[in-house]
Amino acid sequence: MLIMVTGVSGSGKSEYAEQISCQLAKDNKKYYVATMYPYGEEGRSRVKKHKLQRDGKGFETIEQYQNIGGALKGCKRDTKPVVLVECMSNLLANECFEENGHPDNIFAECMQLYSECSHLVIVTNEVFSDGCEYDDSTTDYIRRLGELNVKLAKAADTVVEVVYTIPVVLKGDISYVGN
């Protein structure tokens, strides 16, 4: 199953995506694919917060800042794992603004990763409603994220927007997620 979880910063989407991943994995292997470079104090603080949030949930962390399709390369697997990717906005920024980036390959690489898992949970951000105008490179990034999110939503079995920690189903079903 391919599940996309979206929401604004601080909405609770990460914790919800972890809950879904744990429910789906049961006793199966779970990987948390971290895509954010921990730049500066804010970045390090966010990484620390997410690590504490995952503590004790059985995730093995993979840091994969680009080329998401290769995230499981080198991982020993007896069965197909559950994979949680956190998050598309960071991955896209890395592919757009870092050396040797390939932003146009992200969707295909996500589908490659999906073919290697039993379930893929992808977290993305809702950054489209602030009403601000930006420079050309930021506008291009926001456009690309929108296009990527549309492709992922079309491919996904389930799409959930988390609003103030409340999951709102936009597509599919979440009855498999316990309270």
PLM regions and their residue ranges:
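Conserved P-loop
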Residues: 2-75
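Residue-level signal for inorganic ion chemistry
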Residues: 17, 50, 84, 125, ...
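Helix-adjacent hinge/juxtasegments
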Residues: 57-105
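Residues at the starts of beta-strands that form the adenosine-phosphate
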Residues: 28-31, 81, 119, 158
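Short, Lys/Arg-enriched, disordered terminal segments
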Residues: 1-2, 78-79, 173-179
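Structural motif
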Residues: 4, 82-84, 121-123
